[in-house]
Amino acid sequence: MAQSPVSAEVIHQVEECLDEDEKEMMLFLCRDVTENLAAPNVRDLLDSLSERGQLSFATLAELLYRVRRFDLLKRILKTDKATVEDHLRRNPHLVSDYRVLLMEIGESLDQNDVSSLVFLTRDYTGRGKIAKDKSFLDLVIELEKLNLIASDQLNLLEKCLKNIHRIDLNTKIQKYTQSSQGARSNMNTLQASLPKLSIKYNSRLQNGRSKEPRFVEYRDSQRTLVKTSIQESGAFLPPHIREETYRMQSKPLGICLIIDCIGNDTKYLQETFTSLGYHIQLFLFPKSHDITQIVRRYASMAQHQDYDSFACVLVSLGGSQSMMGRDQVHSGFSLDHVKNMFTGDTCPSLRGKPKLFFIQNYESLGSQLEDSSLEVDGPSIKNVDSKPLQPRHCTTHPEADIFWSLCTADVSHLEKPSSSSSVYLQKLSQQLKQGRRRPLVDLHVELMDKVYAWNSGVSSKEKYSLSLQHTLRKKLILAPT
């Protein structure tokens, strides 16, 4: 089929002939190849792809084939279904098998199915995040933004489809997974037979994802730090290119700062992070003013340059944006302020290194603060006294490499004498100890499943609200790498 560029006239003709559902499908199918493109409609999408040299008659035919507009293949592109199918068998595709799979699943669901799926994912996306009248593809996009669904991460979707008794669609997912694993196995075999083969690819991309820092958010957030959607990059890297991993070899791995204003979980938090290889710095029951001094002191420590990471555990009364010391000052201490003190600008010795935050706050019922978005607070950065020299020629974004796990629960949990330990911190410790050689993000997804399971068996007042936001650029494993 012709690889020649597509004229504006042809793009206009195609766009005029598509209905709204077909336009939605085409925009969805192209999400992997439209990184950094703001394409609000199909015409702009196709025009942008054409300008980038990614749209030819062959790729446009592929898109029309995927949305089943075989009539337009013949009328506008002067080709037919059989010719397109033959071309796809012999040539690389514009659209990933992953996108095709999700589109086909969406076509097989009726509105009741979609409504049930939206309901089942509320504990992951946040209640009210996705309107009930949204389509399946809208739901998928939201789950992708939260990093709950990806080409290699379909467990949540399988679980939800099983709950609505659509086992037939799970079969499609299983076939896709087996096919992907088979392709990866074949590629690894090929690479093993060619040990001197040098593979070059865009250094901004690792495992199909952009290395530019963007906050991946699990759970609802009313404000968004970065407007760009979190999604798979436009480049499809060979499956055998391994994702880059953070260096975690220093002894200790880094300082683990524990500020505990409650005291119920201190012992096993110390044991957990000590077992991971961190040097523990514990502060029990500090006042709010003391917290400020503690955080400033550790943000300016020169020792960070000798370590590969930093961890911080905060346990207190508070909400999703602040914590209180022993004196319970009403305004509390800003969690954004804590995060900003350890960014690459204010703590250069930690630039490019993972900075982990695990937060358990207890709040009065109904007093939850505005939202749990992790945002930059410029003025607060200026208050830090740290003055290390800025590294030269550093290209790492200052907000990169942050892992922010925040759990809130009702303060009534602390009134139970026999079970006042945090379910979140207990299960977090178990996950970190048992799965230390697995990626931290994967462990946290499983942690969210466990907290969800707990929530499903208790009253609303006993439930935990857990969210994860991160700007990790590489795979993070809390073990020597």
From Swiss-Prot:
Interaction with CASP8 propeptide, as annotated region: 6-307
Keywords annotated in UniProt: Apoptosis, Repeat
Location of region: Interaction with TRAF1 and TRAF2: 197-481
Tissue specificity of this protein: Highly expressed in heart.
GO molecular function: cysteine-type endopeptidase activity; peptidase activator activity
Positions bearing the site annotation: Cleavage: 371-372, 377-378
Cellular component, GO, one term: cytoplasm
Residue numbers spanned by region Interaction with CASP8 subunits p18 and p10: 219-481
Domain of life: Eukaryota
Region (Caspase): 265-360
GO biological process: apoptotic process; necroptotic process; negative regulation of apoptotic process; negative regulation of extrinsic apoptotic signaling pathway; negative regulation of extrinsic apoptotic signaling pathway via death domain receptors; negative regulation of myoblast fusion; negative regulation of necroptotic process; proteolysis
PANTHER family, alphabetized: CASP8 AND FADD LIKE APOPTOSIS REGULATOR, DED DOMAIN-CONTAINING PROTEIN
Stated family: Belongs to the peptidase C14A family.
Free-text domain note: The caspase domain lacks the active site residues involved in catalysis.
Role: Apoptosis regulator protein which may function as a crucial link between cell survival and cell death pathways in mammalian cells. Acts as an inhibitor of TNFRSF6 mediated apoptosis. A proteolytic fragment (p43) is likely retained in the death-inducing signaling complex (DISC) thereby blocking further recruitment and processing of caspase-8 at the complex. Full length and shorter isoforms have been shown either to induce apoptosis or to reduce TNFRSF-triggered apoptosis. Lacks enzymatic (caspase) activity.
Name under which the protein is recorded: CASP8 and FADD-like apoptosis regulator
Organism this protein belongs to: Mus musculus
